[in-house]
Amino acid sequence: MWTNVFRIGGLHNVSWFQFLPSETELNPGFDRSSRAEQNEVATYLVLSSHLRLQKEGFLTTWTNSFVGPWDPSQGLYNPDEKIKLWLFLPGRHSSISDKAQAAVSKLRVVASGIWVAPGDSEEISVAFSQSLRNCIERALSGISYMRFGDVFSKFSPQSEEYLRRGQPTVEFIFAATEEAVFVHVIISAKNVRTLSSGDAERMLRSSLKNSSYRLPAFRKCLGLAKSEDNRLCYINTSHRPMLFPPVIVSPHGMRGSLTGFCPNDLVKQVYFSSGNLKTSTGYVGLPSHIGRGSRLINGNHCYVEVTLGCCQNRNDNTSQANSTFAVNLPHNQCPEPSVGSKDHRKGQSDLSSVCEKKFIYPAEAVLVPILQSAFAKFSLKRAGDFDCLGASENKSDGFYEKNGYNSSGSSRNSSISSTSSASSGSGWRMTSRTGDLDADADSLTCRQSGLTCNDDRLKMGSKRPRTGMAESFGQVGIENDQIGWDWDADDDDDDREVGMDIKALLSEFGDFGDFFENDALPFGEPPGTAESHVLVFPPDSADVGSSPVDMMDVSDQIVLPVGFSSFESFNPVPPIIDECLIKSQEVLHSSITSVPSNQMSISSTGEFDHLLKAEAMMTFAPEYGAVEAPMSEISSTFFKSPYLPKSHKVESSNSRTSNYVYGATPPTTDSDGAGDMILFGSKSCIGNNAGRTLYHSREHYTQVEGRKGRHDKLPTVISDNSSTKEGVSQSIHSKHSAANAVKVVQGKKTDGISAVVSTLLSSKTLLATDVGSVMFQAFMCRMRHIITSSKHSSPVSLTRLSGNFFLNQLSNEPSTLTDNISARNEIYKKDIPTRIAGDFDGGMLDSHMSAPVGVWRTVSVPKTAKPASSPNIEAGSSLPHSSFSEDSLLSYGQRQPLQDLLDGIALLVQQATSFVDLALDSDCGDGPYGWLALEELWRRELSCGPSAGHAGCGGTLASCHSLDIAGVKLVDPLSAEVFPSSVITLLQSDIKTALKSAFGQSDGPLSVTDWCKGRNQSGDGGSISEGFTAESALSEVNGVNISDDFIIDKYFGKQAVSNAIDGGKGDETAQSQDIYSSELLRPTLFVLPSPAILVGYQDDWLKISTNSLTHWEKAPFEPYALPKSINYAVVCPDIDPLTCAATDFFQQLGTGESTSLSFVKEVMLKHDRNWLGTHLPQSLGNQMEKDVGRLSSSGFVLLDCPQSMKIESNNTSLLGSLSDYFLSLSNGWNVNSYLKSLSKALKGLKLGSGLYTNQKEGSGSPCVVVYIVCPFPDPSAVLRTIVESSIALGSVIQSDRDRRSILNSQVARAFSSSTAVDEASISHIPVLSGFSVPKLVLQVVSVDSIFRITSPSFNELVILKDTAFSVYNKARRISRGMPNDAFFSSSLPSRSSSALTPMNSISGIWKDCGGSRMTGSTHPRDGEIDVSLRTSGWDTSTSWQIPRSGGLSCDPNRNGDFYLNDEIFYLFEPLFILSEPGSVERGVSPTFTSLGSESSKPIPEDGGRGSGPGMNSMEGITSGSSSQGDVSQLEGKAIPSLHCCYGWTEDWRWLVSIWTDARVLQQGCQILQACSSPDNGSFKPRDFVITRIGNFFELEYQEWQKAIYSAGGPEIKKWPIQLRRSAPSGIATNSNGSSLQQQDLSLIQERASSTSTLYSSHSKQSTFVKGSMGQSAGRKQIMGGQTISGTPRGLFQWVHSISFASISLDHSLHFVLPAELVSAGGGQSSTGMSSVNYIEGFTPVKSLGSTAFSYMMIPSPNMRFLHPSPLQLPTCLTAESPPLAHLLHSKGYAIPLSTGFVVSKAVPSMRKDSRINVKEEWPSVLSVSLIDYYGGYDNAHDKILQGIVKQGGGTKETRDFEVESHLILESIAAELHALSWMTVSPAYLDRRTALPFHCDMVLRLRRLLHFADKEVSRIPDKTGV
């Protein structure tokens, strides 16, 4: 078996040097340089040195980080931020080599040292990792690979427009052991392509059809009239840019917009031959000897122009609400949305920076993202929103004419589009100012999806105002990003049309009465305005993978005059405009773009009159002279009435034609410096500084003055209030404000470096060079660190925070179809990751399913009456607790957010801790929980840079954009399928060649065993012959089968073991010493069987495979616990099609009779068999019930809804019901109205006293299940339904009002506390329990399930089973707090005690059918549970508890004590449990073919892990030969370990923890309570495993360490294994718990010094574990506020070991197995692995995705990744981040001691059942990293290790560290992997997730809690938003 790992030698010791610029280089002789200029020069020095070193073959990189402490009080920017250079030299060096010295001559060394593999510094390791990637880049460029951030793709010119298969891409991440560095080569495929000739053709066609605004185009390349000198001619006819397709550019992988093309010869003539632009590095693109890019234009090679960058708006009062300034922005650039209320537009403008840049790239350096049609059909919730390349851009392709999203694009929702009404925009997000849009094509300039625009170009003059054009349809946070022209901005008393607008032009021109009358067009108004029509182009203009294109809706077909082919007929010889006028497009975002309308006084508009005139002259042919109206005519109505009937020609003194250049030959200049080169031969273009700020409006225009100056051939910038001199334009890339602008006094000169920097950062278009690209990337990286206030504009990705929360939140507004069902499509469209934005290739996404392709369709948008007070949806704050406007509030009266949250928290926990819930888990991970994960990921994309430019996150294509914090794969529209054959072929060819070239000493791709061994191998590790599987390699190393079971006698015989145990040493030779030494360092490689589950069967328990769940009703199986009686009520909207379908659904759920499918009738809950229990309707009548007839008696509670929705359904077919239902929803109901009715209905339910535990009845009383039918299918509506239902029901069942009030006050006090934590109140931190709910179950049923249209498509029986199983697991009946007599007097029968008799391995309460979990334990198993909690007659009672008490456990009066009577917990009664804990005991050492065969069997009794009494999992595992006695003699009945996973919510307000044990049997609190009894001598210590998702923070771990040493006192010294071996700073190992650090001692002076009552019979032992986790680093104490001096042993008398591990899903490993190893029947192949070699094209290969087994792999020596969180987005904190977040991140992540992997069967991916034929899934890989361990050995194990140490020499610390870590890690990993199989269900037979279920629940609960916290925290007052 091959891996994708390569080994690099010679890098185990590396010298590193860190550089910063020399101070002398930053002061070039005068002291007037600004700080910003120094920063830019410093950046240039560092980056140019880096590129030079890289070119010469050195390992080098640059990093941008904060030097010194972060001090937000210093303003928006950290003053100490610098760009640093790193140089790595293999070996030990005290100085830099002479070869490198020249490149760093202008830098100074600020730090240096030696990096010793695997490294112990996160910062150095990350920099080293990046330098290795840079080195590989050089090698790959020689074989035609281009770099796009962290992703590499091979350039291959394509003749086709798109590929059906994705483009292969390569990523590299790096790991290290003590001896070598390993490269993990991640092969994937992306839906991208290179540029094609069709792109140029479409751009040409688009420019011709819209010549009123033509693309900046080269006449030569577009085939237009050629100028005599072939100079570039920009036809810039308007300041309004056209919207261009997004592209991804090399080398940084940033997202940009394609804006032009140019042939090779022209670029060479201008750049390469002129010699004016010199660079010390090189140009972006493939090396010249390889060749250039595609032949895009007339069979010739071509360069392209790409616009990169963004803009930042940092003022909290510059909202784009209802404004139109966005229409004046340069290409694809929008101001960052100001997220807040509409009142924000009244503030002052204060743009912080402007950053846009145009680069000229070779075609091979540009990729175009595409979307395959099949994926679009699949992921309707995500795929329509093409702002994944930058959410704020939201621009459609200028030439990809798709738009007009009016339908769902889904077959099941096809009826939605047919009933479309009201607006054609994204109605639920638009700003409604003037009522509905007119039902014509012209009004459809908005984008219905929130993304696209039917015609986003300049509208030709129209005399009729278009109501609704002011509507804005951007994403949430960008709602008011104007699309199209605002022809009627007459509303809301605002004059936002500041700057260039069509009305300004028309004001200059006056009446259009005879403007267009000539021979070409004999009519009196511009084309397209007589009627409401818009041009629509054929479908070939789209670039979607061969799918239909959704076209513009028009009323009828229009036939244009012949002369209207383009505007060329108006002006046969159009003037050639010099490029200097294009500066108006290159200087970004002056106050024109974001100043609120009322900030632009009318008196100031005259200042721009000459500019308006110039704009007009640029727009129209010269024979039509400009006209100008006196100011008196346009003063107050300048932006109101675009037509002035008395206008007349006036030559303004400010508008002299001599000031503007129109000729083909531009004015000459005597400036020939590098800093003054203008694109394509144009001469210097003078920036108008005018002594104003960079953001002044006039700087959008360039004025050529007659006076020129020259000073030493370098341009200067003149700071003057009245005139502008020639000079270099001010840098637009500096992040400083106007006060920090570059101020170069005339007559002074700058040095060459400053000139180069000015050139690179000027506003001019430049050829893409290495240094220019990296300079721009570095600038964008710095920009992402801007600290933004919650009231300020947020980086674009953060605007998604409240994105879909706005769904249907227009209160008091009759909703239309768009408001409800089509809104789901908007959700589908919204949620494509931010990096793929723009409306590229997406016209087909929501095409009408029955619409013809490429034809005209009429616009018939019926108007829907809206109230005059229809509110505007404004953007809410993107930061916590102010995310919503008043219009998004649920109007349920005055809400109390905190009280609501506390009411609903128990039921929220119930929902999140369900193993599988189809309502939340459907859509292949794209359901509500997937939606929450995506939202969280987008909020983390601050690291991507401003406007999601993707400068600092690894590029647009990086895998980190589709992985959540746990490594779970999320929806990624760019992801494509990659096949094992492609992977191994690429690894064996290009990658192998490149790594050999880059590093010389490179072996690979390694076999599994070679990778696990991690040491030098004989021969060429990269040869084809090394492509064995792990089995063959294991058997061929010196003839020894190196399994990882450490069974010593397997290799050395029993005598050697005996010698080791006896301590014999006299007869051993040096050879045997080496053998022993190598034995300690062997890798782990095991084949593990898939875990089985335990269910009930008749009066016994049965061990079955997880696949058997599909046969539940046929077996018939029974639940592991007892049957449960269920009384249910269904709350359903009173919509006839829905109620009919729901009635049928719940009847089948209860009786198992299916009317639509011919499956078995007795399904699940059939009461006569009592398989799960009874399921009967119960009338919970309330005032809502009226005229419900049979529904009332059937347990239905109907919600009131608008009368217009109550349509009678006469359809009996499913399709008819669907059509009727969607038609009903289109009649005016929205989510807000539904939730209001739902809340009222739930609060009125007569639940009665039956919910509360009756001690006499015990568990015999039935549970009440409330089913909520959610009528809206979109994820946010389902989530909001859950939140509102939980709150409403929680308020009903809450009985203890006094306790509730106390809890509310405590939580409120905790939230309102100051930054400085009051240590005295630590003991009063509220801890909320998620399982104090009585016999009540909340189950939301989606409309998809009701209509049986789930995605993926489950059959009806599966849906019913999963729903029933989910309800069964949620139902809890037995109270842990009731008296024991009542507890055990249940009337329900238990399993027969005789059933336990034949299972001799079982004792006490354990239900098992197999052997012990881990044999060989020295501790007896009897009495694991406190005898007071069980009796001999109830052996099975307490085994139904699950430690899913989920971090939310609570006693408001907790002061170190826990009183059962204060809070009652209800025990978990599971449907099934694991038959045995995960363990390597039953693992198999792989042989030659076991990995490829399903016939592997456990190793025989005498030689394998599967037999013999091994060690307890946390104690280490002994060899098989050391325990030859009987199992019973060693009392090897192991006690399951306790597992805890915890994590913080995103806003760091809540800590969530979930407990379980290795078999999902016991509840952690229950066991800990039993531990606390001093009289319980039979209870044995347990192993504790503390798990963190992702990584432990170093400070976080140190706090754990302090707690352990403080609590354990001197007992800690007695634990023989402490892997880190050092006590925390300030903690003495002989401490009795009171000798803490001095600052900590002061915190507990006022606490009681008496013996803690924590260990009394009623104490809650979980206080320490849970309480300490919830405390911030460095300050928190333990044990509920009392000292533990009187109890020196503390908790640890019941703790055998404590382990800390981090967990995530790994995507860095590929495993490829020769397919011929497995015969058709699954048996072993006759060829054997040893004879199989890979031959490209002839050796069939497969992945491990379909394997029946799991594989555990732990490399040796201990391996760790150089980057602590590979494939994860970088974390960027802001001033809004809580102090705890800053504190924990300050020291980075804890470095793991060892990392292991468990490879198992593939979990259904996002693409499964998505109409994509996925031939083979890749396996799921669980990564487990050991952080630390405290514990001990058993005697046998200790003797063996001591014997080996004596034989091999050396100390125990140096010889057994790795074997200890391996033994511990493999046991932990096995248990964690087994816990993932608890998520199996009939719908997910291969598990729902590969994460352990308790870790997955932490993810779900923390996200749901965060969502609920924000949902209830909406503030009704606008000012609070």
Curated annotation (Swiss-Prot):
The record's note on quaternary structure and interaction partners says: Component of the Mediator complex. Interacts with CYCC1-2 (CDK8 homolog).
Q: Which domain of life is it from?
A: Eukaryota
Q: What happens when the gene is disrupted?
A: Abnormal embryo and cotyledon development, and embryo lethality in most cases. When viable, plants are small with greatly delayed flowering time and sterile flowers.
Keyword Transcription part of the UniProt annotation: yes
Cross-link Glycyl lysine isopeptide (Lys-Gly) (interchain with G-Cter in ubiquitin) lies at 220, 226
The free-text tissue note of the record is: Ubiquitous. Highest expression in the shoot apex.
Disulphide bond pairs: none
Q: What is this protein called?
A: Mediator of RNA polymerase II transcription subunit 13
Q: What is the lineage of its organism?
A: Eukaryota, Viridiplantae, Streptophyta, Embryophyta, Tracheophyta
Q: Which family does it belong to?
A: Belongs to the Mediator complex subunit 13 family.
Q: Where is the composition biased (Polar residues)?
A: 1486-1496, 1515-1527
